[in-house]
């Protein structure tokens, strides 16, 4: 098997039995199971959900996206070796830690394979729940240009790049393009304030006003749990993005849960603790790949300027990145995962074949 064969780049063509179109995201693909298969698995596997809950198979890929584009490497390498397994392993670890600390559940019901989750259908909150402990990235870029109000929060004068903020800040943005909300542009990833959410909580997917407090509590509590665990391995949890949604429990009650992934190098910035104390920033997250791209291409404005999206898409499509750059990202992701979980990350030689075999033999979901 070649290195390219070990990468799962295309994850929306598995022969999983479904009666709905496969939903393909930047990294994961979702296969909604038939009602009959959902009910069968809930019964035979003993999932603790109502018997009529829709289930899905969520398959992660090794693709890497940055600046809203998918990048690829030399030698036909269409993704990062080990990336998908590393992301899932990290999320699985944090979700388990959340449960041990009495926080909310996640949407995951079963983990058949390192690349695969079986999840319950949730009603998503249309908010990217972003939490920041340090001033860097887009917040620093805005601050350095003189902006002091960020998502309705007034920042103090005198802050310096990459310093720890006086308090943990929640700086949400829109998830997807939302229309008809006063004061909120119909664009993806628009910064919003808590007052925006309060005034339009139902449009953002909240079932009741009090759940805004709950989502903020779950966001901050989850951040603190991960931050403490990362500090124990001398890593700095800088900022992150969580997602939330509602599910219905066996008693018919609606409850707020964590969705998607949490605390990964894709959804977070993680810095090396020793380097930070020495006044340096050593990225253990996708931010390192973003910085590589900005330095690799002669005109970094293409990657930053939303008005140049067609050029950016062509740049990503037409350029094979150096193999060493792709492998450096692989080492970052698998290294963080192994530190977090305390276990090596399995790298199957042919993940697609493995997934099909398990879903056929143990779940009877392959057609």
Swiss-Prot record:
One of its GO terms (cellular component) is cytoplasm. The keyword Acyltransferase does not apply. GO terms for biological process: 'de novo' IMP biosynthetic process. One of its GO terms (molecular function) is phosphoribosylaminoimidazolesuccinocarboxamide synthase activity. Keywords: ATP-binding, Ligase, Nucleotide-binding, Purine biosynthesis. PROSITE patterns: SAICAR_SYNTHETASE_1. Its EC number is 6.3.2.6. The keyword Nucleotide-binding applies. It catalyses: 5-amino-1-(5-phospho-D-ribosyl)imidazole-4-carboxylate + L-aspartate + ATP = (2S)-2-[5-amino-1-(5-phospho-beta-D-ribosyl)imidazole-4-carboxamido]succinate + ADP + phosphate + 2 H(+). Pathway: Purine metabolism; IMP biosynthesis via de novo pathway; 5-amino-1-(5-phospho-D-ribosyl)imidazole-4-carboxamide from 5-amino-1-(5-phospho-D-ribosyl)imidazole-4-carboxylate: step 1/2. InterPro entries: SAICAR_synt/ADE2_N (IPR028923), SAICAR_synthase_Vibrio-typ (IPR014106), SAICAR_synthetase_CS (IPR018236). It is an enzyme of class 6 (ligase). Belongs to the SAICAR synthetase family. This is Phosphoribosylaminoimidazole-succinocarboxamide synthase. The lineage of its organism: Bacteria, Pseudomonadati, Pseudomonadota, Gammaproteobacteria, Alteromonadales.
């Amino acid at each position: 098997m070649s290195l390219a064969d070990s990468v799962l780049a295309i994850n929306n063509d598995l022969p999983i039995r479904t009666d709905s179109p496969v939903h393909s995201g930047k990294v994961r693909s979702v296969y909604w199971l038939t009602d009959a298969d959902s009910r069968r698995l809930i019964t035979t596997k003993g999932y603790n959900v109502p018997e009529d809950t829709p289930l899905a198979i969520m398959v992660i890929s090794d693709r890497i996206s940055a600046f809203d584009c998918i990048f690829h490497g030399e030698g036909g390498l269409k993704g990062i070796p080990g990336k998908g397994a590393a992301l899932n392993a990290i999320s699985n670890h944090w979700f388990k830690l959340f449960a041990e600390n009495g926080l909310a559940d996640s949407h995951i019901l079963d983990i058949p394979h390192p690349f695969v989750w079986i999840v319950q259908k949730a009603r998503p909150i249309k908010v990217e729940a972003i939490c920041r402990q340090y001033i860097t990235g887009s917040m620093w870029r805005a601050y350095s240009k003189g902006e002091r109000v960020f998502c309705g929060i007034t920042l103090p004068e005198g802050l310096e790049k990459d310093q720890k903020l006086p308090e943990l800040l929640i700086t949400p943005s829109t998830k997807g393009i939302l229309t008809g909300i006063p004061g909120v542009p119909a664009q993806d990833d628009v910064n919003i304030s808590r007052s925006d959410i309060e005034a339009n909580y139902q449009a953002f997917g909240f079932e009741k006003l009090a759940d805004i407090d709950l989502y903020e509590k779950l966001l901050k509590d989850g951040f603190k749990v991960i931050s403490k665990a990362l500090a124990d391995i001398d890593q700095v949890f800088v900022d992150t993005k969580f997602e939330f949604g509602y599910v219905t429990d066996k008693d018919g009650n609606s409850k707020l849960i964590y969705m998607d992934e949490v605390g990964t190098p894709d959804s977070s910035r993680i810095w090396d603790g020793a380097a930070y104390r020495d006044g340096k920033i050593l990225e253990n997250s996708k931010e390192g790949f973003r910085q590589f791209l900005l330095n690799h291409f002669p005109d970094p404005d293409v990657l930053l300027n939303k008005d140049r999206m067609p050029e950016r898409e062509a740049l990503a499509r037409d350029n094979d990145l150096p193999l060493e750059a792709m492998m450096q990202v692989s080492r970052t992701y698998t290294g963080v995962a192994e530190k977090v979980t305390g276990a090596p990350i399995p790298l199957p030689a042919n993940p697609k074949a493995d997934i099909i075999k398990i879903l056929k033999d143990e779940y009877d979901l392959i057609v």
